[in-house]
Amino acid sequence: MATNGVVISCLREVRPPMTKHAPSMWTDTFSNFSLDDKEQQKRSETIEALKQEARGMLMAATTPLQQMTLIDTLERLGLAFHFETEVEYKIEQINAAAEDDGFDLFATALRFRLLRQHQRHVSCDVFDKFVDKDGKFEESLSNNVEGLLSLYEAAHVGFREERILQEAVNFTRHHLEGAELDQSPLLIREKVKRALEHPLHRDFPIVYARLFISIYEKDDSRDELLLKLSKVNFKFMQNLYKKELSQLSRWWNTWDLKSKLPYARDRVVEAYVWGVGYHYEPQYSYVRMGLAKGILIIGIMDDTYDNYATLNEAQLFTQVLDKWDRDEADRLPEYMKIVYEFILSTCENYERDAAKLGKSFAAPYFKETVKQLARAFNQEQKWVMERQLPSFQDYVKNSEKTSCIYTMFASIIPGLKSVTQETIDWIKSEPTLATSTGMIGRYWDDIGSHLRESKGGEMLTALDFHMKEYGLTKEEAASKFEGLVEETWKDINKEFIATTNYNVGREIAITFLNYARICEASYSKTDGDAYLDPNVAKANVVALFVDAIVF
């Protein structure tokens, strides 16, 4: 016992193996950007004029298929927010009308997906007419690529109990992957290619919009008005993003943390990408900036616990942060004083912003989520450094916090008009929508972390916990986690619609859904991490902020 005590005591003074993070790829790329206000105003006026024509098109669409196809195109092009009232009006018309018995697979699936994505209750029984007596989709459907794609996209808004939609995923993926697409229109080919990588419902909305604009302009059946509007709109937003990013970069550079805390990541641009993913629409400037700052706090904390602090230092930092008192800073090592000041100062600015925006009630909650996150990071560090393997259930409970979902949501509350104190009370109850979206990110991160960290054999990951508890191989555990991702998405889909019963607005529900979407795009299909490894996020940064759209 005495020997064990000495070992544990010594272990608490050991620093974790330090990962040398790649430097920022962007340094001063955006900090000196200057927006031409006159040109931006001209774009705004052009958008308004084109919107009037597009609105007329939408309201003139009379048949359900015309309405659904146009709404789908507007959403794919990143334009639907301009017509929110009109789109919801049309969606309600589509929902109120009985489904046309003559709807083919394409139309049936499109209607089903759009209604669910707009939080309407619609039964998956609408697909019964396409299955045989054994409950299998009819093989005659396999030659209808457009219908298969529509069903594939619709199947990804399913719930756990909807077995027909899981069958639809398997059926459509099998046939789409094996389809001869050479004779299909370019638009269909490109949609299929992207969908097999990232189903539309799970895709990064504004990144997809940028991609779809480039596909749409090559389509012979394109609408020139919508194409022009989408290009001017994207150019307008791209310049707005670059302006915000320049302001954020200058703020970040004043702290000079990349030299003061060399163990920490310098990822201001990557953090801002997440902000754009949460809400890309122009009116959500505070959400984008606020989330980026929240993520930078999280990143500094994560790297401090995971990449540098000893167990004793981490425990002390957790205690000091819990007191939230500058007078306590003298108890900390010098490098931790810098971290502590960065957190407190950023939160003080948040508190002032919240007061100006009529959201003073948000500040105490934001502080509490930061403290909560510190405790969860500290627990995770103990498990790893002391090589303890918690039960999978204990891991999941702690991971709901280290997913950072609560801190990230709290960081943007001042920029969300619909959030009230009642919203915060709802989130504090840890609703399924919040916990499930958080776990999507956690599961994908754990899969990638295991592939990265186990290469060096130094760090324990969540897959190690699962392998030991259930006697699985690494491959089996990774497969199990990917299965957990799929099932958790089904919970998100169900709760996204159910929030309409909790008096939780669409703005809030979309925020949580978009967190899961960004995680899916950032972590899946790779062993990289779009925040840890700048090369993973590079394509999104270039598409959103660097590449100019060609008119």
From Swiss-Prot:
Which top EC class applies here?
A: lyase
Q: Subcellular localization, per the record? A: Cytoplasm
User: Which InterPro entries does the record cross-reference, listed alphabetically?
Assistant: Isoprenoid_synthase_dom_sf, Terpene_cyclase-like_1_C, Terpene_cyclase_plant_C1, Terpene_synth_N, Terpene_synth_N_sf, Terpene_synthase-like, Terpene_synthase_metal-bd, Terpenoid_cyclase/PrenylTrfase
Report the EC number(s), separated by commas if there are several.
4.2.3.67
Q: Which CDD domains match?
A: Terpene_cyclase_plant_C1
Q: Which cofactor does it need?
A: Mg(2+)
Q: Which GO terms describe its molecular function?
A: magnesium ion binding; terpene synthase activity
Which GO cellular component does the record give, naming just one?
cytoplasm
Identify the residues that bind Mg(2+) 3: D445, E453
Q: Which family does it belong to?
A: Belongs to the terpene synthase family.
Q: What does this protein do?
A: Involved in the formation of muuroladienes. Produces mainly cis-muurola-3,5-diene and cis-muurola- 4(14),5-diene, but also smaller amounts of gamma-cadinene and alpha-cadinene.
Q: What is this protein called?
A: Cis-muuroladiene synthase
Q: Which organism is it from?
A: Mentha piperita
